[in-house]
Amino acid sequence: YQVDGLSATAEILVDEYGVPHIYANDHYDVFFVQGFNAARDRLWQIDLWKRRGLGQLSEILGEQHVAQDTAARMFVYRGDMYAEWLAYGNDAKRIAESFTAGINAFVKIAKANPDLMPVEFAMLGYEPSLWSADDVVRIRSNGLWRNVVTEVWRARLACQDQMELAAQWLALEPQWQTETPAGLDPCVIPENVLDNYLLAKAPVDFSAQPPQEQLASLLEQATHD
């Protein structure tokens, strides 16, 4: 491929196991090629998950995803990006810029060569969007995990004065007797406190399931997990 953005020639060698190995003479070229290869291998997946993280699914999949988009946008970082980048390593922004430039380089090639474009884009009737370095750090919902579900569950047990059930269901190592801090009322947590959290981190649902049914399924799954 001939692409703009590299300081010199770089290589991607795919071994017999399908593992790509990147060779470049410049530190930032490595990240450029890594982004290019990620897009070459899974452009539709990363485009979909970027849209999921930024709350842009309804733009391509319809109004049934508005609720999930709304939830996702509650977790998108909206602070000052200059200060945010300063909180990372000295060259973190340049690394992210190189990586996303590599993604964009493949997107441009794929748009000019339809055979390289994943078939899912044609099936769903849209094209991949370009990336910015800020996208990499603004998206937070992809990193959300399950601890908050456990915390809410414990609070509800505490509200019912049944904290002993927590130890029977989920053993702690070393053993620990949880006590409700003085002045803390665990009963004030609203029933719907997890709704936006679960929607924001939910996988993309292509079944056209109504938002309330999707949320009910997510709540049931979270309860069983």
Residue ranges with predicted function:
Residues 1-225:
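Substrate-recognition/specificity elements adjacent to catalytic centers across diverse enzyme folds
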